[in-house]
Structure formats: C-alpha cells, structure tokens
C-alpha cells in the first residue's frame, strides 16, 4: 500500500461506488473505517475488493486479548491488506491480535497489522490531563511504538511529526502510517497534528492516509493526483 491511502469516510456503498467510479478503474489504496464498516457490514469489503482496491480496515480494536484474537480470526477471512489495534491495549493484546490474523488468514499471508499510538486529534495537554500521562506526547508515541515492535506487529499509526523518531528507533522497515494529511489549501478540521503530503514524506512517513482533501474536493481525481504528486516529489 505505497500509494496514498484514501479514507472512504462515507456511510453508504452508493456513496463509495459513486466516488470510486470517478477513478476509471484505477487500482487504489483505500481505508474502510468504523462509519462505513458498521453501517454496511463485511459485505462492503467484498464489494470494494471486487474492484481490485487494496484495503486498510481501520477498526482500532481494543479489548481483552482473547476477544481481540477471536475478532482478528474473523477479520483475516475478509482478505483485507491491513488492520489495526490500539497500542494502549498492551503487548499481550497486540500479540493476540497477530496470532488471530495468522490463524484466520486463508492465503498463507496475514494482513499487515499496525497499532495506533496517539490519535492525531490528541494534543500533549489533552493527553497529560485526560489520560494522566506525565510523559511528553513524543515520549508516549515512542513508548507505544517500541511496545508494538516487541509484540511482533508491522508498524504504527502516528502523526508525521513523530515518524522520523520512530524510524530511528524501530528501523525503516517498521511502518509509520500517517493520517492527518491535508493539502496546504485545506482546513485541518478536528485534527491537530496535521501536515502536507510532501512534508510527511520528508519527515519520515512510510504511508499516508488522506480523507477530506480528496473526498470533499470539487474534483476528487485532481485532488488525488495532487496528493500523489506531492507524496512522490
């Protein structure tokens, strides 16, 4: 999934179908999140797969290890390319998630598994006040990244602002999947740690997730091509 990942932040398959139709059969990397998956169920994944798109299923599992393991066995059977959990669920939970994917994968190759460190909507002040974390935001992200690697996962979800430090700590093969990407002309909305595609590339992101800059654009194809151009600059 080296192409920019488009966040399909829609509620219905009809909206998804109309959006994807604009790309004239091009094979894309897309993210199916909670809104779309919970509104339509697993069938939405199969419909998108039939169009030859790579899928990041973004459900951010966070529960006791046995529950997450069982859930991942089921998700693995969907044939998606990448899934995620919350790193704050702990090392045992993340290990259980990986084991579930390995059991459930029918192709012999499990989906990539990454863990959310801190949401890009979270500021350092929010984290320290609401989560009672005394460390800095960067220290928290690096701690979760190290825990994720110890659990045998493939990488993390992080903001681009922490990506280079994670790369130095955990190696270049450890994925740094970055949401909160906007074209320079777009509003940041509810996300705080936000950068442009070109900036994300220059400071260490391995993959980027782009939603509103593409899906809400007057010309989504042109916006996607601009993101792609900046990402590959």
Swiss-Prot record:
GO annotation, cellular component aspect: cytosol
Pfam families: OMPdecase
EC number(s) given by UniProt: 4.1.1.23
PROSITE patterns per record: OMPDECASE
Gene that produces this protein: pyrF
Catalyzed reaction equations: orotidine 5'-phosphate + H(+) = UMP + CO2
GO MF annotation, one: orotidine-5'-phosphate decarboxylase activity
Active site: 60
Protein name (record): Orotidine 5'-phosphate decarboxylase
């Amino acid at each position: 999934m080296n192409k920019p990942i488009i966040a399909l932040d829609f509620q219905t398959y009809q909206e998804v179908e109309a959006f994807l139709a604009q790309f004239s059969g091009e094979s894309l990397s897309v993210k199916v999140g909670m809104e779309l998956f919970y509104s339509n169920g697993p069938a939405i994944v199969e419909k998108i797969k039939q169009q030859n798109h790579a899928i990041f299923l973004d459900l951010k599992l966070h529960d006791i290890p046995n529950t997450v393991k069982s859930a991942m066995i089921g998700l693995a059977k969907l044939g998606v390319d990448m899934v995620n959990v919350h790193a704050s669920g702990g090392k045992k939970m993340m290990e259980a998630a990986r084991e579930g994917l390995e059991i459930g994968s029918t192709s012999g190759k499990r989906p990539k598994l990454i863990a959310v460190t801190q949401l890009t909507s979270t500021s350092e002040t929010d984290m320290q006040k609401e989560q009672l974390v005394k460390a800095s935001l960067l220290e928290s992200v690096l701690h979760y990244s190290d825990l994720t690697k110890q659990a045998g996962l493939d990488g993390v979800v992080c903001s681009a602002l922490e990506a280079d430090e994670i790369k130095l700590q955990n190696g270049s093969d450890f994925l740094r999947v970055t949401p909160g990407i906007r074209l320079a002309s777009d509003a940041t909305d509810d996300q705080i740690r936000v950068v442009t595609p070109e900036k994300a590339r220059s400071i260490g992101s391995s993959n980027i997730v782009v939603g509103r800059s593409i899906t809400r654009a007057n010309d989504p194809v042109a916006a996607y091509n601009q993101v792609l151009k900046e990402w590959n600059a």
